[in-house]
Structure formats: C-alpha cells, structure tokens
Amino acid sequence: MVTIMITSALHRAADWAKSVFSSAALGDPRRTTRLVNVAAQLAKCSGKSITISSEGCEAMQEGAYRFIRNPNVSAEAIRKAGAMQTVKLAQAFPELLAIEDTTSLSYRHQVAEALGKLGAIGDKSRGWWVHSVLLLEATTFRTVGLLHQEWWMRPDDPADADEKESGKWLAAAATSRLRMGSMMSNVIAVC
C-alpha cells in the first residue's frame, strides 16, 4: 500500500502534494488547500518559477504569491507536515538511509543583496544555506521523503553568527531521532 502510494506520488503531482501537505497545520483549512494546490503546480513544473508553473493563469499565480506572503503561513508548519508524512511512509521499510548534508542556494538577482554571505570575504555570492536529512529506502534507494530541513543566512561577519554551523548537524540528528522514535534503530545515517 505504501509502496503504491510512493509510486503514484512520483507520477501525479497532485497526489504527491495532497499526501505530503494535506495535514499542514496552517490555522485555516483554506490555507492548507492553497498549499496543496501551489505544491502540486510547482511539482508539476519542477524547477520552474511560480509564473511558469501557473501556466498563464493569473489568478493561480497571484494566489501562490499571496500564500507565500501571508504572515499566518509558517514555513516550519509546512516542513513539519512533510516530515510527518515521511515518518508515516518510513514505517513500511525495514531499513532506511538518512542522507544528511549542507548546501548553498546562490542568488544573483536584485533581492540577493538582502541575503546572507556564501563565499569567502571577497566573494559577492549571496543566498541561503540549507541543511537537509533525506530519507531513502535502503535496498532500492527510493526516496521516502524529507525528514528534516533547516535554512539560514550566514552573516557578513562570522563573529555575528548566533551559533556554530556544526551545530546544525547535531540539531538535525536530534530532530531525526525525535521524529523517528523507535524506528531510529532502522536508520543508517550517511553524513
């Protein structure tokens, strides 16, 4: 049943979005419905902008941007809904791989000036740092889902950092253990 759901979700963006995000606690069921719709459109046009994924429908595009700008929408609630679906799917597998890594998302357009430092002192690259834990089924390497993700902006002056970035790895491991509970004994961490 779970394997069928994963396979189906890979082929139908709307099914995937509904299975991953329909339990998001956004304070109003209309927001959750909008999240599912926006996620489905973006998944259907993977790697494309909201404008392109809206396929010429201005109402869909404006709805997506209003959703993103809504102060009542919590990125943490969205991430948590996805992680909880990952935990639910993980129950079907006897052995899992938790792939953990940090990467950067580099931006060059106008808004990039407000983002964090990515490179060395003289480097002008700006963007986000993202630390993720991706859960895979161990024998087929099929993606189960995203178990944890945290993103932050690095300050221009390293002395202004709130914490050492190595702490992101420890926090990810602790969150993974908390979410997986007794299933953690089935998980092989790959860092």
Regions found by a protein language model. Give the residues of each.
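Conserved, well-structured functional cores that handle cations and Mg-NTP chemistry
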Residues: V2-C191
